[in-house]
Swiss-Prot record:
Gene Ontology BP, a term: placenta development
UniProt KW Signal keyword: yes
Name of the gene: Plac1
Organismal lineage: Eukaryota, Metazoa, Chordata, Craniata, Vertebrata
Secretion signal span: 1-23
UniProt function note: May play a role in placental development.
Organism encoding this protein: Mus musculus (Mouse)
Family: Belongs to the PLAC1 family.
GO cellular component, one term: extracellular region
Protein name (record): Placenta-specific protein 1
Tissue distribution: Expressed in placenta.
Source species, domain of life: Eukaryota
Locations listed in the record: Secreted
């Protein structure tokens, strides 16, 4: 029984290590406005460390966020020669390349990167009427730039709760 638990634990650890070593070395995110690529320093393999000054996006755009464990390119889709292709009325594909040129040798690589994004942002809602409600609750008084949303209780008023005494600056008895 103990041997079975040991072997099961060993297999689990081996699986976790294998999964960790197979991480994506390049991650791409995009929207209708932004194109973001994250590159890990061991981009090519685990033996070659890629310095941030050896990589660029598209037409020479350097990483604009450099961290010890990743470099990030975050540019508008209209910059760096990023290409745009509409594949349907609802989806657009953005594509570019990560260019690697080693400073210590003549090694060069081009890694294609692409991302699909919806044409319409899921964060934007449909237009709605800006008219105030009929009971005029949302209207502002004349010559006033703000309106009353809620009132805070007076300092002497305390809500009915079982809060600790220090919440209301009272001394405990």
């Amino acid at each position: 029984m103990n041997l079975r638990k040991f072997l099961g634990g060993t297999v689990l650890v081996a699986f976790m290590l294998f999964s960790y070593s197979e991480q994506n070395q390049v991650n791409v995110l995009c929207s209708t406005d932004w194109f973001m690529v994250t590159v890990h320093p061991f981009l090519l393999n685990n033996d070659v460390y890629v310095h941030f000054y050896e990589v660029h996006l598209g037409l020479g755009c350097p990483p604009n966020h450099v961290h010890p464990h990743f470099y990030q390119f975050h540019y508008r889709v209209t910059e760096c020669g990023i290409r745009i292709k509409a594949v349907s009325p609802d989806v657009v594909i953005y594509s570019s390349e990560i260019h690697y040129a080693s400073k210590g040798s003549s090694t060069k690589y081009v890694i294609p990167v692409s991302c699909a994004a919806p044409r319409r942002s899921p964060w934007l809602t449909k237009p709605y009427s800006a008219k105030a409600p009929s009971n005029n609750m949302g209207a502002t008084p004349k010559n006033d730039t703000s309106y009353h949303v809620f009132t805070l209780p007076e300092p002497s008023e305390q809500p009915n709760c079982s809060c600790p005494p220090y919440v209301y600056n009272q001394k405990s008895m």
